[in-house]
Amino acid sequence: MGADAEPGITPTPIRLHRQAEKIIEESKIPFTFLRANYFMQNFVNFSSHSVKTQGAFYVPAGNARISFVDVRDIAAIAVHALTSTNGKHEGKAHIITGGEALSHGHAAEILSEQLGKKVNYINVSDEDARKGMKDMGMDEWIINSIVELFEFAKAGHWSAISPVTEQITGNKPISFSQFAGDYAVAFK
């Protein structure tokens, strides 16, 4: 989400996505863009180990509210776009979000409920996040991109809720609570 935001405030990864979209648009190849917000599954990829070992996860997100989206909803929309024969998705950019905008603190509460154990969200400074990622061996450009993305979130750019999932699939977006229950084994 944000690929069409103002160039001066848009994080590098999103700007690069938009550049790729422009190339596709100019090619005149039929397209449908799926502009998905922050994936719920990022919690599994980036936080499950620390939740298992420390009962906490560490993110430089402050109190930013984010409409996290489950990748299963993105996949369902992709199926509709790819199998539609009426052309209603052609040339469109679908903004895909979850059905609720949550802070990481609220996400920790939901994880706690679903896992049956206390999970804490620790808001870390950008500097501490950079150090932690560097210590993990991450490349500098990835570190910078992640910090930029969370700055974008803290500025309120990922809190909007889009009706696209329900409009296209006929189903409400998967809730964070359902995600946490479905993926509980990854955090235990």
Residue map of PLM features:
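Oxidoreductase cofactor-interface core, primarily capturing Rossmann-like NAD(P)-dependent enzymes
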Residues: 3-120, 124-127, 131-136, 141-142, ...
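A hydrophobic C-terminal alpha-helical subdomain
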Residues: 127-188
